[in-house]
């Protein structure tokens, strides 16, 4: 079974951040042949209170083929992510977004360092409209990333041909971009009750 390690700033049961959360949930629901490990925050977008009833800083069974690590702000570090990647030893690292230090840039650097197969979902962040918000800061960051060849080892996931064009326009036509549309919602996903049964809760 293919093991996929996903990094995303916010995930279910949080919904405040919108589309990316649902897109990732749909991806997980549509691929029961894979085992997913989602590394995320233990709070929702723009929220300060932790999710009720969910134990943070450990792997929690979310569905039959998905576990989630709800990380607290105090425990969030590059070393923590590297340790979890080493412990899980996934076949694929799937990064959501471009700019987040903890959930995009750190995983990208770690994946490159250890030679891990890495997929980056830009989530529309390289569209002309998105680049128009704080453009100078983004221009400097993306220029720096191109200079470092930071995405040379990456496969980009675009959800349309338009997004593929946006990615290659910003980062270079040589970028490996695969187009896979967002998947339709299959079923509601919600965290299952935490179980101490062997194999259902991993303490790393």
Region locations from a protein language model:
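Nucleotide-sugar donor-binding and catalytic loop/hinge architecture
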Residues: 1-3, 187-203
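N-terminal subdomain of nucleotide-sugar transferases
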Residues: 1-52, 60
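Active-site proximal beta-strand in glycosyltransferases
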Residues: 3-4, 92, 108-128, 155-157
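Membrane-proximal helix-turn-helix segments that form the acceptor-binding/catalytic region
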Residues: 138-156
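Short N-terminal targeting/anchoring amphipathic segment
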Residues: 82-103, 114-119
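A conserved catalytic-core segment of Leloir-type glycosyltransferases
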Residues: 37-92
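Carbohydrate-associated surface elements
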Residues: 162, 183
């Amino acid at each position: 079974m293919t093991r996929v390690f996903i990094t995303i700033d916010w995930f279910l049961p949080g919904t405040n951040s919108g589309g990316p959360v649902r897109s990732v949930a749909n991806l997980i629901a549509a691929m029961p042949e894979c085992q997913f490990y989602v590394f995320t925050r233990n709070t929702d977008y723009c929220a300060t209170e932790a999710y009720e009833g969910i134990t943070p800083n450990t792997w929690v069974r979310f569905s039959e083929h998905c576990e989630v690590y709800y990380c607290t702000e105090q425990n969030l570090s590059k070393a923590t992510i590297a340790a979890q990647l080493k412990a899980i030893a996934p076949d694929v690292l799937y990064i959501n977004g471009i700019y987040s230090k903890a959930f995009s840039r750190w995983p990208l650097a770690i994946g490159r360092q250890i030679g891990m197969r890495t997929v980056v979902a830009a989530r529309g962040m390289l569209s002309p409209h998105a680049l128009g918000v704080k453009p100078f800061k983004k221009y400097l960051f993306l220029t720096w990333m191109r200079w470092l060849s930071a995405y040379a080892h990456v496969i980009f996931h675009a959800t349309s041909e338009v997004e593929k064009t946006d990615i290659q326009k910003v980062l270079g036509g040589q970028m490996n971009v695969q187009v896979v549309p967002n998947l339709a919602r299959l079923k509601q996903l919600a965290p299952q009750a935490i179980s101490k049964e062997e194999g259902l809760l991993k303490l790393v």
